[in-house]
Regions:
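Membrane-targeting and insertion segments and their boundary/processing signals
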Residues: 69, 103, 169, 173-181, ...
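Aromatic-rich juxtamembrane segments at the membrane interface
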Residues: 79-201
């Protein structure tokens, strides 16, 4: 990038209001060019929505190499003009149009677009998602990959297993179905574009499949670290991606629970305790970046299970043109509020928390500390609330 002023054509990813440290609300625009994504501050007169194309001038003097490597940074801008809307050309844009056509409520349409296509969400919906604590369900990640894989496997098994049993009993249908599922996931990854959490989940799935074929132990922290390093080597900007950090941390805590605690309980108990463990263990990391805390966030413990049914069902409904069936329920749900507050985590506590997390690899007693940090966070909230 050349220093000084530069004229750009960019697409609006999201537009939302944010309260500044001086108490004033500002209009934040997240814009995407062919080479990078950046934030800028708009004016009250700007009327930009997600998907709009705009022409603007920016000042890039303060963009550091680290910021540019991260591919997401801030640049002041001026002379912002909305360009005439062009017909959707890409497959992704056409799918977005199909989703929006099924919903009168643009917020709900935006929610489904984020669920299925990994598009960004605006400020109001972002606040609703934070209030419920379901950001990990909205952002496409390993959870979605698991649901997609399970549904694909169920359909393939239902249709093709009898054929394999009669004509190809010597072949492993599980192996063949897994290859087909990976091809489906590759196409999905191409369609939705680069999403760090989905990339991590996909690479781990491939690594896990390879290890199963070679009869190598899967539950291994070094496998996880290897996939993380490989991902960063391919895409250095992941070092500065919060979503990638959350994704890796969530899987790490799943590994910790399965490694230390799962053998002591039944399958049913583990399905409940694993959910609780990861929820509390992740709390400090989430609060450090998104300090909103509310008792309503406990509902995610139940929503995690319901999502496994809702996600494929809502996809099928959209496929047949009935995507608006849950709109009224979702609108009321997103609007519902309980008392909330901002609980700010200091950098020292955050670094201590991460150091303890790494120690979990070698020392079992430390595996109890991250969820205890999370429990303490809610206790502090209750004390302040009372």
């Amino acid at each position: 990038m050349d220093n000084g002023e530069q004229e750009l054509t960019a697409r609006v990813i999201s537009s939302y209001q944010k309260m500044g440290s001086d108490g004033k609300k500002r209009q934040i625009l997240k814009l995407q060019t062919d080479d990078f994504t950046f934030y800028t501050i708009g004016s009250k007169s700007d009327d930009f929505r997600a998907g709009d194309s705009i022409f603007l001038s920016v000042i890039n003097l303060d963009v550091s190499f680290k910021d540019y490597l991260a591919s997401t940074f801030y640049m002041p801008s001026f002379s912002r003009e909305k360009l005439p809307q062009k017909p959707a050309h890409s497959f992704n844009q056409k799918l977005q149009s199909l989703i929006y056509a099924q919903h009168e409520n643009s917020k709900i349409a935006q929610l489904y677009s984020a669920l299925f296509l990994g598009t960004n969400i605006d400020g109001e919906l972002r606040d609703d998602v934070s209030n419920w604590g379901v950001a990990h369900l909205i952002a496409i990640s390993g959870y979605h990959l698991g649901v997609i894989s399970a549904v694909c496997f169920f359909i393939l098994r239902l249709v093709f297993k009898p054929i394999y049993a009669r004509y190809m009993p010597y072949r492993s249908y599980i192996f063949d179905f897994t290859i087909v599922i990976f091809l489906v996931l590759c196409f999905y990854f191409y369609m939705i574009g680069f999403i760090a959490s989905f990339l991590r989940a996909f690479l781990m799935s491939v690594a896990g499949f390879y290890m199963i074929c070679k009869k190598i132990k899967i539950l291994n922290f070094y496998t996880l670290f290897g996939v993380i390093l490989f991902s960063v080597a391919l895409f250095p900007q992941l070092l500065f991606n919060v979503g990638f950090y959350f994704s890796c941390l969530g899987v790490f805590y799943i590994y910790v629970y399965l490694f230390y605690f799962a053998p002591k309980f039944s399958v049913l108990a583990n399905s409940l305790l694993l959910n609780l463990y990861v929820f509390f263990a992740m709390e400090v990391a989430v609060l450090y970046f998104f300090p909103l805390i509310s008792l309503l966030q406990f509902s995610v413990l139940a929503i995690n299970y319901l999502f496994g049914v809702f996600y494929p069902l809502s996809f099928l409904l959209h496929l047949f043109g009935y995507g608006s069936i849950f709109d009224e329920i979702l609108s009321k749900m997103l609007a519902f509020r309980l008392s909330s507050n901002n609980l700010h985590i200091s950098t020292f506590v955050f670094l201590l928390y991460n150091a303890i997390t790494l120690l979990c690899v070698k020392f079992k007693p430390t595996a109890l500390l991250p969820p205890l940090f999370g429990v303490a966070s809610f206790l502090l909230f209750l004390l302040n609330f009372s």
